[in-house]
Structures are given as C-alpha cells and as structure tokens.
Design a protein with these regions (language model features):
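Short beta-strand segments
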Residues: 10, 104-107, 161, 186-192, ...
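Conserved beta-ketoacyl condensing-enzyme motif
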Residues: 6, 23, 27-162, 191-202
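Condensing-enzyme catalytic core mediating Claisen C-C bond formation in acyl metabolism
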Residues: 3-7, 34, 214-285
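Short, well-ordered amphipathic alpha-helical segments that serve as non-catalytic structural scaffolds
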Residues: 76-87, 143, 170, 242-243, ...
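Structural signature of cysteine-dependent C-C bond-forming condensing enzymes
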Residues: 1, 86-104, 117-132, 149-157, ...
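Short polar catalytic/cofactor-binding loops
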Residues: 9-16
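Active-site-adjacent elements of ketosynthase-type condensing enzymes
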Residues: 41-51, 110-114, 193-220, 238, ...
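Short conserved active-site loop signatures built around small residues
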Residues: 167
Length: 285
C-alpha cells in the first residue's frame, strides 16, 4: 500500500492571507469574527461573520479573471499556490511529472454571490445583460480548474460538494487517489466565499446562525450550552499530498502522514446529525 504524506500548506483566513500570518495571529489570541462589512447588514438578524480582509484577487489571478470570477475561486487558488510553493513543487510545460499531479478543491456553496448578482441583472435588465462569466466564474469545480491552469496540474481533477465536509472529503479522496497509484501529488482542500446577502439570509432564516451581534468575538461557541448558531466564515485551506517515496526521493519537508480516511452518512435529518453519533462511529472502525 502506497503511503501518503503532507508536504505543503496554504491558507487564506479571517486571521490572515497566508499560513504564517494566520498562525501567528491565532497564537496571539486574535479573533477574525466581527461585524460584516461586505454588504449592508442592518436588516439582517445575523450581522457578524469571519471575513477575509485586505485580499486582492489580482495578486493571484490574471487581472481579467480576478474581476470575472467569484472570490471563492481566488481564495482557493491563493491557498493552493502557497501550498505548492511551500512543498517546493513546480511543474513546467512539457514536464511529464505534471500528468501525475492533480487537484481537488471543494466548496459547499461556491459562487453564490456571483449567481445572485447576475440573477438580479436578469430580472432588472434582461437576459442579454447577464455576464458570460456567470457560469464559469461561479461553478465549484472552477477553483481547482483555475489552479490547474495556473500551475500546470494535469493529473486527476475533480470536486467534492458535501456542505461542511467538502474540504475534508477533498483531502480524503485525494489520499485515496495517491494510494491506488493514479497520482503522485495531489493539491487538496476547501474554499468558500459565501458571506453575501443571499448566503447570510438563507442560513439566518433557518435559525442556523448566531445572532450574538453585540459580542462577535465570543459568538462561535459550538460546544457551549449557550450556543445559538454558527458563525459564517470564508477563505481557503489547502494541502499538498504526496506519495511518501516520491517526497523522500526529492528531499521534501514532511509535515505528517495520512494514516486513513473513512466516510459515512447517518441517514437521519436534513441538517441535524443523529444524537447518538452512528455516522461518526462507522468510518473509524
């Protein structure tokens, strides 16, 4: 059985736009949750979120694409490129190793903001005024697709869309791809950018979001008896996974090894996990 290790890290978060900045802010006890500034939240029940700050998509994407793509794609590409740089991997044109390097970048919702803005354009100005980039700039698989173009990744390229588990499933599926010999390197993780009017409104009317607007720094408390919902965040977290012998042969820095991966569903409620936790038990057996 081929072994799978982690050799690269990439991160865009409410605490910083790279791994080092985010990690140092976390160690300093910083909190990235605050009042939402991306749009006017005055009439919303939930008015707080974990926004990515001071992020310029044009630093990571070609200028035209930075304007045309939803921001979740830019988050994913930024974190993916940081992870590849951290791993010391670069695949030039004509490099046969590129055919053994793939990508799985996932999201739970994808380009909701871009879709909704174009829907508004459709209603107000008609179908001919909708952006021709509405579809390619918002569909979830374009995050990995754009990264593969930017970094010449010609191996397996797919997307998992499983709500909050999307990024974890991306990493797990990527590890399986390497184990079975279909790739030597996989860039895998999740990206999301759904702090937008429709995203907040949709979760808020489900009573899924915290309304602790007067205390955003302490609003996210999932295991507290006083919890009142989750806090929407945005950003991307990406790993470079690599076959162990491949990593060792090139002298790569190895962070850890992925020992296993399991998945299941408890066939219960549409949003609420089963309280006795069978879905968490089965994959670990």
């Amino acid at each position: 059985m081929r072994r799978v290790v982690v050799t690269g890290l990439g991160l865009v978060s409410p605490l910083g736009n790279d791994v080092a900045t985010s990690w140092n802010a976390l160690l300093d006890g910083a909190c990235g949750i605050d009042r939402i500034t991306l749009f006017d939240v005055e009439n919303y029940g939930c008015q707080i979120g974990g926004e990515v700050k001071n992020f310029d998509a044009a630093q990571y994407l070609p200028a035209k694409e930075a304007r045309r793509f939803d921001r979740f794609i830019a988050f994913g590409c930024a974190a993916g490129m940081e992870a590849l740089d951290d791993a010391g991997l670069k695949f030039e044109q004509g490099d046969p190793a590129a055919e053994r390097a793939g990508v799985i970048l996932s999201a739970g919702i994808g380009g909701l903001d871009m879709l909704c803005k174009n829907y508004g354009t459709l209603l107000e100005r008609g179908p001919r005024r909708v952006s021709p980039f509405m579809i390619p700039g918002s569909i979830i698989n374009l995050a990995g697709g754009e990264l593969s173009i930017l970094r010449n990744l010609k191996g397996p390229n797919l997307t998992t869309v499983t709500a909050c588990a999307s990024g974890l499933h991306a990493i797990g599926e990527a590890s399986w791809i390497i184990r079975r010999g279909d790739a030597d390197v996989m860039v895998a993780g999740g990206c999301e950018g759904s702090i937008c009017p429709d995203g907040i409104a949709g979760f808020d009317v489900m009573h899924a979001l915290s309304r602790r607007n007067d205390d955003p720094k302490h609003a996210s408390r999932p295991f507290d008896t006083g919890r009142d919902g989750f806090v929407m965040g945005e950003g991307a977290g990406v790993l470079v996974l690599e076959e162990y012998e491949h990593a060792k042969a090139r002298g790569a820095k190895i962070y850890c090894e992925i020992a296993g991966y399991g998945l299941s569903g408890d066939a219960g409620h549409i949003t609420t996990p089963s309280t006795d936790g069978p879905g968490f038990q089965w994959p670990s057996r």
